Amino acid sequence: MIYVTGDCHGNFRRFQSDYFPEQANMTKDDTVIITGDFGGVWFGDSRDDETLDWLERLPFTLVFVCGNHENYDALERYPVDDWHCGKVHRIRPHVLHLTRGQIFELEGHRFFTMGGAKSHDIEDGILEPDAPDFERRLTMLQRKPRARYRVNHISWWAQELPSDEEYAEARRSLDAVGWQVDYIITHCAPTSIALMGSRHNEADRLTDFLQEVRERAKYHYWLFGHYHDNKAIDEKHILLWEQIVRII
């Protein structure tokens, strides 16, 4: 069995048995995929352990692509391992980060993964904690109603968008299978879908790359998160947030 759900932001209440009773019939051979903004690796130290250990005790294997609200510095410290023909960061034995540009073979189906998204809650800037005026700027923003800012390497990371090498890895992976997969798992959507949503959405390098994938690849379903809604865009593209849906 394979299920997919959307952004968690470190809140995993949906995986309690009262909310996800289907897990009673699942084993570690079954998989639940989170479409980004996992948030379980946030502090990068022992403060994450209680939550991660609880996730490891769940009866299924939990995997996720990265979103734009992840501690990338901490994620990158985990060992890279091979899993079902692709590369993962192994957070716990059965809690895995599906890295970008990979194709995983799960239950006889190909899954292409390309996590990440551009943050749009940074209109008031990204603060540098080592800057001499950091405290002054932070105090000013804290006094501003509904200020939208982040702090570099504390609440925002440049790695939220893929590197040149990750784009190249994605192209190599897709070339190797003739751009034919069964499922695509991303955090944000292709440009044509992203622009259908909020006025804050705009095209960027990642959404444009995903638009190319949409136009070139052959696939059955594309599941993504980021936009905090549960919605079928059309017969192939599914936006997920709190819902947990079975796909296999």
What are these regions (language model features)?
Residues 158-248:
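Internal alpha/beta domain cores that form substrate/cofactor-binding pockets in large enzymes
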Residues 93, 107-200:
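Active-site-proximal loop/helix segment associated with metal-binding centers of metalloenzymes
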Residues 43, 73, 122, 194-195, ...:
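Generic domain-boundary/flexible-linker signal
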Residues 8-9, 38-39, 68-71, 117-118, ...:
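Catalytic metal-binding/acid-base residues of hydrolase active sites
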Residues 2-4, 33-34, 184, 223:
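Residue-level marker for buried hydrophobic side chains located in beta-strands
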Residues 1-4, 8-14, 134, 147:
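Acidic, histidine-bearing metal-coordination/catalytic regions of metal-dependent phosphoesterases
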Residues 5, 11-106, 199, 203-211, ...:
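Core catalytic region of metal-dependent phosphoesterases/phosphodiesterases
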Residues 1-3, 102-113, 183, 234-238:
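Beta-strand-turn-beta hairpins that frame and shape the catalytic cleft
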